[in-house]
Structure formats: C-alpha cells, structure tokens
C-alpha cells in the first residue's frame, strides 16, 4: 500500500533536540541550566502586559506587529518599516530560507553553528556547506573559501551558541566585503545583549549601509520571554517585503507583542541581568579552570566546559552525576562536542552548587 512521501531531503534532516527537562533524585531541588534561559524571568512590566492582554483574547492581533516594531525602532533607532517580527527568531530564520533558498542553492554555516541552520536550509531543498572553525570560533577566510556560484545565504551566529565565542566587527565587515553582492549575510544576534566587548557590534550598521545583510534578534534570552516565542529582524526593505509576502498573517500573538514592548522598555531589568551574567560568567570560568577543566572564553549567558576523555571523567559521566543532584546542563553530542557540557549561568545558588558538584565529581577515584 502506498503512503504519502515527504519532499526529497526532509528525512535527511536531524530533528532539533532541545535542552533536556529536569529530572533528579526524589526530594532534591532541580535547577534547569540547559536551555540558556534567564534566571530572573521577564520584566514585571512584561508580565503585567501579558496578563492585561487576557481581557481581549477574542481579537485577532494586528497582523504586522506594528506596535512592537515601533517600540523596537525607538529602542534601537531603526526604521520600523524595515523590521519584521516572528514567532521567535527561529521563524524568522525559516522565513529567510523559505524566501531565498531552493533546490540547487547553497547556504554556508560554521562547524558549531546553531542547529536550526541546517533544518531551515535543507527543508527548502538547499545544501548546507560547512566552513571549519578555528579554536571554536568563526574563521572568516574559511567561510569565504566555501563560497560558490550556488551560495545564496551565510548563517553567522554572533556570538555563537553553543561555543559562546564571537567575531569582532572588523572581521564581520571583512566577511561582508568578501561575499558576492547576491549573497545574504544573516547575523543572528540572539545573545548580542550579553556582549560587553569594545570590538563587538551586532551588525545593525551593516544593515543600514548594505543591501544584502540582515540582523535577527530574540526576546527569549535576556528579556525572558522564551515561552511566548517572539523575535524580530532588521533588514533591507526589499528583503523584508519579500518575507512579509509569505509570513503568516497573524504570526505573533497579542500577549507576546505587548509583553515584548514592555520588556524592551524596561532597560533596568536588562541591565540587572547583564551585570549578573558578567559577574558569574567570570566566576564560573575561574572556578572550573581551578578544577583542571578547560573553559572556552564566552561572551554569552552560558559557559562551555570541556571534560577529560578518561573513563569515569567524561562529559557524559559528569552529566549523569550532575543530573542526579538536580543540576541539568546541556550535553552537546548533537553539536559534535561530545566532550563538553554547556552550562547556563543561573542564580548564585545554582552556580555555586554546580561548581561544588563538579569538584566532587572530579575528586572521585
């Protein structure tokens, strides 16, 4: 008996695997540190706006997220007409791929780039080409070497998840200058709000001065609205127009839009989260290093910790040990980093408990 067959290449796509849900020994407090969620939750103003929207759930949203686009425009000094909003930046990435990729096309990503990139690329029949990284960091020359006449998109998470590394803005500009004009450079800035380096820029300036660069952002991380699925992109008017033609007519909900407006306006909440992240990122990196572990320098709200390969001391062993203590980190086998764990920077209590547990783990015979 025949049955429906997916389009070519769909079954070759590895499903996205999110950070695991908390499971621990009975009676033990659990800390989920596997999905890079903020330990502070959203702004109280965002929560109030979300609850206030419940009075009119019978109404459709304004289809273009106008109020949110205007709030983003005010916050960043951008033209709202060049902003498109989506159900998380994931939807934006998929819309980009759906608009500009097809069979015979190629998109480039780096070795340890975000796992949504291959999904978005291959779902549209295109081929994902991998550019090797150098020291777990994007190598601009490696990307440029992979460009072919079939290249249509370059995916660049800056800073990158899961490594936490970033590309200085001068290198991003060099990348843009080296790409053909028909190639769109996608600068995924999901973690941009956490970066405090003087040589870093999210890329908005490039969008303003070129016709082939876009920047995507999310409200899921520092703004704490992951459950609402809300994100945005700033790009050239013609790219935004093309994407709007295939965007779902009511793709972002009223509660999500209003909560995001309140979140972006609460700069004090953002600054508090940023300061906490910087303090504990430095502390965690130092403490793990004291335990003999290698930590990849991070500018994000997480750290990448590398474990030995000796039996009983591996990342998988550490993951099992920590999970039993109610400390849930992210294993990275599906990223090709089986010897590392990614830890979201949590509350002071959670951070200290993880270091204590890792010390106990490393002290085992």
Curated annotation (Swiss-Prot):
Reactions listed under catalytic activity: L-histidinol phosphate + 2-oxoglutarate = 3-(imidazol-4-yl)-2-oxopropyl phosphate + L-glutamate
CDD domains linked: AAT_like (cd00609)
Cofactor(s) listed in the protein's UniProt record: pyridoxal 5'-phosphate
Source taxon at top rank: Bacteria
Protein name per Swiss-Prot or TrEMBL: Histidinol-phosphate aminotransferase
Modification N6-(pyridoxal phosphate)lysine, positions: 221
Lineage: Bacteria, Pseudomonadati, Pseudomonadota, Alphaproteobacteria, Hyphomicrobiales
Quaternary assembly: Homodimer.
Top EC category: transferase
SUPFAM superfamilies per UniProt: PLP-dependent transferases
Pathway assignment: Amino-acid biosynthesis; L-histidine biosynthesis; L-histidine from 5-phospho-alpha-D-ribose 1-diphosphate: step 7/9
The protein's Enzyme Commission number: 2.6.1.9
Gene Ontology MF term list: histidinol-phosphate transaminase activity; pyridoxal phosphate binding
Pfam families: Aminotran_1_2 (PF00155)
Gene Ontology biological process terms from the UniProt entry: L-histidine biosynthetic process
Record-stated family: Belongs to the class-II pyridoxal-phosphate-dependent aminotransferase family. Histidinol-phosphate aminotransferase subfamily.
Region feature (Disordered): 1-23
Coiled coil: none
Gene symbol of the encoding locus: hisC
Alphabetized UniProt keyword annotations: Amino-acid biosynthesis, Aminotransferase, Histidine biosynthesis, Pyridoxal phosphate, Transferase
């Amino acid at each position: 008996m025949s049955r429906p067959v997916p389009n070519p290449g769909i079954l070759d796509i590895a499903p996205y695997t999110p950070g695991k849900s908390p499971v621990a020994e009975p009676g033990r407090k659990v800390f989920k540190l596997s999905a890079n969620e903020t330990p502070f939750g959203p702004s109280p103003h965002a929560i109030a706006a979300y609850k206030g929207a419940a009075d009119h759930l019978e109404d459709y949203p304004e289809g273009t997220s106008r109020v949110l686009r205007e709030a983003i425009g005010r916050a960043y000094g951008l033209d709202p007409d060049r902003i498109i909003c989506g159900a998380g930046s994931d939807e934006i990435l998929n819309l980009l791929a759906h608009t500009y990729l097809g069979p015979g096309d190629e998109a480039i990503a780096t070795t340890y780039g975000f796992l949504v990139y291959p999904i978005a690329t291959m779902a549209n029949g295109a081929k994902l080409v991998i550019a090797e990284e150098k020291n777990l960091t994007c190598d601009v020359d490696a990307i440029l070497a992979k460009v072919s006449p079939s290249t249509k998109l370059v995916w660049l998470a800056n800073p990158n998840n899961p490594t936490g590394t970033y590309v200085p803005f001068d290198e991003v500009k060099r990348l843009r200058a080296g790409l053909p004009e028909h190639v769109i450079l996608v600068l995924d800035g999901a973690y941009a709000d956490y970066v405090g380096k003087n040589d870093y820029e999210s890329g908005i300036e490039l969008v303003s001065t070129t016709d082939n660069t876009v920047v995507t952002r999310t409200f899921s991380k520092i703004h704490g609205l992951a459950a609402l699925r809300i994100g945005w992109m700033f790009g050239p008017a013609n790219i935004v127009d093309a994407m709007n033609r295939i965007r779902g007519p009511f793709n972002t909900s009223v509660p999500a839009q209003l909560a995001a407006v309140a979140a972006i306006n609460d700069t004090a909440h953002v600054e508090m989260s940023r300061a906490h992240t910087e303090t504990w990122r430095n502390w965690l990196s130092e403490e793990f290093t004291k335990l003999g572990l290698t930590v990849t320098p991070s500018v994000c709200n997480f750290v990448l910790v590398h474990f030995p390969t000796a039996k009983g001391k591996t990342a998988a062993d550490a993951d099992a040990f920590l999970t039993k203590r109610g400390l849930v980190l992210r294993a990275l086998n599906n990223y090709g980093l089986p010897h590392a764990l990614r830890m979201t920077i949590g509350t002071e209590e959670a951070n200290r408990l993880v270091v204590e547990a890792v010390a106990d783990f490393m002290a085992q015979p």
